[in-house]
Amino acid sequence: MIQLRSSQWREYLTNFDQDENLTAAELDNKIYICLSGRGSFRISPPLKKFVQQKIDNPDLTHIFLNMKDCQGMDSTFMGVLAGLACLAKNNPSLKFQLTHLSEKNENLLVTLGVNRVLDYKLQSEKDNSIFEPDAQLQLSMKSDTKTKAEVSLEAHQKLVEIDKKNLIEFKSVIELLQEDLDELNGK
């Protein structure tokens, strides 16, 4: 595991390859989100914000996240997915589902226990038809360092909540993120 000091972590959060992309469309009380590139800490804040803004719509029945073009996922992204899945489960009429998940990405979810709280379909499943609405909104990838740190902290806390074994893996990450947030908040 890589050990970073608070200042290094902040630099890592701001200087990262920007080949990730999120698009979304809303049609017939369903939201279709497409991820291209890596599911990472960088893409997590806009995904979380977008879903949280939409999830309280009483007419919303489905949120689909198309993972067909997802090249991999980091722990922050998986923690955000777990948190969104748990949030969606508070509304019994709403289904939050990953579609077109590769076996490689499924294995990543299994490693951290996220598969236990997420509903998903693999790329190999026959009833996993591809639907991509014509008009899609490009989600803004902008978020400040504090927001990224907050989302990363909450995501890692969620990973520990769903599987206590994750505390061993992420204890120092959680502590580092908390220290960084305290510093950013002037504490």
Task: Please tell me what each predicted stretch does.
Residues 75-80:
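Phosphopantetheine-attachment site and its flanking helix in carrier
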Residues 81-85:
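Histidine-anchored nucleotide/phosphate-binding helix
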Residues 72:
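Residues immediately C-terminal
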Residues 1-69, 86-187:
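STAS-like cytosolic regulatory interaction modules
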